[in-house]
Amino acid sequence: MAMRFLNIGYGNIVSAHRIIAIVSPESAPIKRTVQEAREHNALLDATYGRKTRAVIVMDDGHVVLSPIQPETIAHRLNNKEDLSEEG
């Protein structure tokens, strides 16, 4: 089985099959999730200093911050051409 990767902005990629959720960072529960991940050293900031527009929750407990809108990431995830393949 080939691994598939998803571009989450500025050349950063994550493993597509390990994504649990792609959500907006605006709600209080998501802000708490991000803060808890930061406290447990499980936060990956892929924004390059830009505004966080999406929070990606991974199956291993890591939380990834992305500067790309959640809808755009979901569209890339559903569009097979936007996934890079390794293997």
UniProtKB/Swiss-Prot annotation:
Domain of life per record: Bacteria
InterPro entries: RemA-like (IPR007169)
Signal peptide positions on this chain: none
Pfam families named in the record: RemA-like
Family: Belongs to the RemA family.
NCBIfam families: MtxBflmRegRemA, PRK04323.1
Name the record gives this protein: Putative regulatory protein BA_4010/GBAA_4010/BAS3723
Species of origin: Bacillus anthracis
Lineage: Bacteria, Bacillati, Bacillota, Bacilli, Bacillales
